A protein has these predicted regions:
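Canonical P-loop GTPase G-domain recognition
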Residues: 86, 93-148
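Short, flexible, glycine/charge-rich loop motifs used to bind or transfer phosphoryl groups or to couple energy/partner
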Residues: 5, 47-49, 78, 106-107, ...
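Residue-level signal for inorganic ion chemistry
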Residues: 12, 80, 92
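Structural beta-sheet core signal
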Residues: 60, 89-91
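Histidine-anchored nucleotide/phosphate-binding helix
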Residues: 71-82
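N-terminal accessory targeting/assembly segments
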Residues: 1-70
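Conserved G1/Walker A P-loop phosphate-binding module
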Residues: 2-21, 27-30, 125-161
Length: 161
């Protein structure tokens, strides 16, 4: 940083730089964030530390198996709304259940009005419904517990599966 009065940029930040011919360009400032996720920075003085910025949608992922947890979904929805972005709920691993109607009813109870999609990265089921969010100029953050299929979904959307 040129001036030491700002936090370092985070994923998604836009910055102003001063280009230097030797390749060691300087960040002059971080531009204002439209949306962001933060966490409490560890240490004796609690303060927020941004972990992602300037995204349009938060894909909140819960798998249709033993991982499904309405209380966790509520917490993730709160984080998404606080970020300033639009939450979208993805119920993953549709290939592992015969009937997902009860899950959809529970999601509707917890998150009335939030767009919800049932998907499977393995079979491709429901992925076409995500195209409306994945348009040029849109940025998406994936939020979910370990094992819900975040990496598998990214790979499927990128055509690697």
């Amino acid at each position: 940083y040129f001036v030491d009065t700002q936090d370092f940029p985070t994923t998604g930040d836009f910055v102003m730089i001063r280009y230097v011919d030797d390749g060691d360009s300087l960040i002059l400032t971080t531009l204002p964030r439209r949306t962001y996720f933060s966490r409490r920075e560890p240490g004796p003085i609690p303060r927020d530390q941004a972990v992602a910025a300037n995204f349009d949608y938060v894909f909140i992922m819960q798998s249709l198996n033993m991982d499904f947890n309405p209380k966790r979904l509520e917490r993730y929805l709160t984080l998404a709304w606080q970020s300033g972005a639009t939450p979208v709920i993805l119920l993953t691993k549709a290939d592992l259940v015969e009937d997902y109607w009860d899950y959809l009813m529970e999601v509707d109870r917890v998150a009335t009005g939030v767009n919800t999609h049932v998907v499977s990265a393995q079979t491709g089921y429901g992925l076409n419904h995500l195209n409306r969010y994945l348009q040029p100029g849109n940025t998406v953050v994936f939020l979910g517990s370990s094992g819900v299929g975040k990496s598998s979904l990214v790979n499927a959307l990128a055509g690697a599966v």
